Structure formats: C-alpha cells, structure tokens
Amino acid sequence: MKKKSKLINQERSITWVNLGIALASIHYGLGFLVGSGEAIYTNGPRGILYALSTAIGLLAMVIIAPFYWTNRDPIWKLMGRYYGNSVEKIVAALSGVWMFGVIASQILGGASSLAIFGLGKIPSLVGITALICLLSLIDMGKLTKIFFYMLITSSAVLLLSLLQIGIHWVPTSLNSLLSTPLKGPSVLEEASGVLLTTVLLTVMGMDFHQFLVKARTKRDSILGPLFGGGILILLSILLLSLIYGSIKNGDTAGITDPRQVIPVILLRFGQSVLPGLGILLALPVVLVSVGSGSGVNKIVAKTILDLKLLPKHIGYKRVVISSGIFTLLLSLLGKSIIDLIVSFYAIYVGSVFVPFIVYLRDKTAKNKPASQTTVKQALVVSTISTALVFLLTLFSNAIPYRPLLILGAGFCSSLIVFAMSKIAPKLHA
C-alpha cells in the first residue's frame, strides 16, 4: 500500500503554473488561431467567441477539478465501474468521436494555408490529408515538440504583427466586441451553442483530465485551470485585436478564403521585414496542421482498436487511412473550422452529459441509483439522436445554430429515457 501511495505521489508532480500552461496548450492550436481568424473575418468581433469559450471552459473546470483529482480515472472508467462494461465502452468510444472534428479542422487550416502558395483547393486538402495519414503511421518521437515550437514561434510573430499595426487596436477591438449586439437571425442561438458546447467539452474532455489528475496537490488542480483560463483570455484578446486591426487597415484585402487570414498576416509581416521571410513564417502553419492532425489521428485509431469495435483483421493502418478519408470528406463540405469542431464536440457532450450528471448524483445521493440498463439505454438513444441531427443538418449552411440543436437532441432524449425509467421501471430493470 505504501508503494502504491509513493507511486501516485511521483505521478502527481505538476505545479499549478505548468498545469495551466498544459491545459491552455490543448485548446491553443489551429482551430483557435485559424478558426478564429476565419470567424472574425466573416462575423466581425463576435467571431472570437469560440476562443473566449475555451477560456471560460478552463475556468469552469474549477468546479469539478477536486472530483477528478481525487478519483483519477477517466469518465468512462468511473461510469463503467458503476454501470458495467457496456457503458464504459460506449462512453470511451464517444470520447474519441469529437476528435474527428479536430482532425478535419487541421486539414482545413493546413490546406487553406498551403493554398496561398498557389496550390489549388482540392490538391491542398488531399495533400494535407495524405501527410497526416503518413505521419500517423510512423513514430515521430521528438518531432512533436518541434511542431509545438513552430506554433509558439508563429504566435510570437503574430504578437509582433500586432505591435507593428499598433497596440491601440486592443481597446478599439474590445470596444467593438462589447458594443456588438447579439441580435439577428439565429445569432443568439449560435452563440449559445458555441459557448455551452465548448465549455462542457472542456469540463468533460479527457485530454484535459489527463493533466489535471497529475497536479501536485488538490490546490494545484484548482489554480491550474484558473491560470490556463487567464492565458487563453489574454491570447483571445490579442488575437481579436490583431485580426480586427488588420482587417480595418486593409491588410487582408483580396482574401477569397477567410481561413487564410492568419497565414496571410504572417506572410505579409515577414515580407515587410525581409523579402522571402514571409514564406518561412507562413509555412509553419501548414506543418503544425500536419503534426497536430497526425497526433490526434493516432489517438482516434488507438481508441477504436483498444475498444475492439472492429473485426480483428482490420489493423491500425486501415483505421488510420479510413479516419483520414472520413475527415477529408468532412473538410470538403465547405463548413467553417469552428462549426466542424463544435458540432463534433456537441455529439459527445449531448450524448454523455446527462448520464454523467446522473452518475454524479448516484455516487453521492442516498436514493436508489439508476439501473445499468437505463444508463446504457440513455447513452444509446442520445447517441443516435445527436448523430441523426448532425447528419440531417450537415449539408445545410443555413443552420448556424447546429451545435445547439445537437445538444438539445442529446439532452432531451437522455432525459426522456430516465423519466420513462421512473414511470415504467419494469422496462428498465
């Protein structure tokens, strides 16, 4: 017992500062940068909502951080221990679903960046997908750190770009954001969907959990998310200021693809400093998309194989390529980066949130817990509901509040199943 306690203490070595940086870095990627650039260019200052939602999500983690830190295991293991192996497998599978949206966003971001060098849209999409699949099949080792450093370098260049156009754009852009009314067709519904989905995904996402449980103390597990949230708020403000200022200055004039805002800003800043430097500054966005996309693709493939969801003759290579083809098809639909990311977030959150809340209630309440059958049925029905709404709205660009619809379908179907278990308990025994 002493050895086990000593091992746990060794694993729990992350200070709140390092924890905050780790949590912030999970959200801070191409979806955050290129996706926000696209959204601000298209929708104005309110396009920064997704970036701010990631920060609010980390701040909200404070509520559940002590629970995660104490119990250590991921959601699917906790629920599986309580409701059985089937529930564990369903929740674990769903926890990987939202990553498809992340891979698709990397393809879109990388391809749009590659297109500014003269390559066509389709060849760019296919090329980035092929590179993601290729890197998913090899052990990159320390290359993953290089991709991270490239992202940090690009961020530093963006900060220099902001200083170049003028720091006065910070208060100007914030004033514009605060004075932007949340009115118009579906604007409030769209904003609510992005905010609610992103916050809940952050609270329930196992990417964040894996770092949280390694916090040195329970206090560190609380301070870490607060620090990480603060970092993302600062980055969101700087990003909004840069993009808003660049648009108003005419630095993004002539852009035909809104996803190219960030790469074009990097390119033009580099060219203003030294001819040819712009290419070197914009190219890392392409490389980061490939590196990040392959990393997530590996996790998806490993999750599918670990859960034994496919026949034994289907190996890792096939799963990686199939995942790549699926996300390539998603990227061809013409959706925005943030729309794709948040829609897949909504499938996971909409399917798992209510059963997870029921688990938390059952764990602490003295009343009779929900049966294994009821929880399993709730997960299955909510998964089908969210998937159907996702598919039915996938080919329409006239539904900006898709995430809210997906969430609503999942929440309502789960609640109906649990309500029916009270009305007709014999059916759920």
Tell where the protein language model's regions lie, with residue ranges.
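Extracellular loop-to-transmembrane helix junctions
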Residues: M1, Q10-I14, E38-K77, G230-I233
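A generic transmembrane alpha-helix motif of multi-pass inner-membrane proteins
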Residues: M1, T373-A429
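Membrane-interface "cap" regions at the ends of multi-pass membrane proteins
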Residues: M1-V34, G141, L160-S161, P185, ...
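Select transmembrane alpha-helical segments in multipass membrane proteins
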Residues: I14-L23, L52-I56, N85-W98, L182-G193, ...
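Transmembrane helix-loop boundary segments of multi-pass membrane transporters
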Residues: E38-A51, G80, I107-S124, G141-M150, ...
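Helix-loop-helix module between adjacent transmembrane segments
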Residues: S53-K142, T197-T198, L283-G295, K312-Y316
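Hydrophobic alpha-helical segments and their helix-loop junctions in multi-pass secondary transporters
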Residues: I103, I107, A111, I116-V126, ...
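Extracellular/periplasmic helix-exit of transmembrane alpha-helices
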Residues: G224-I265
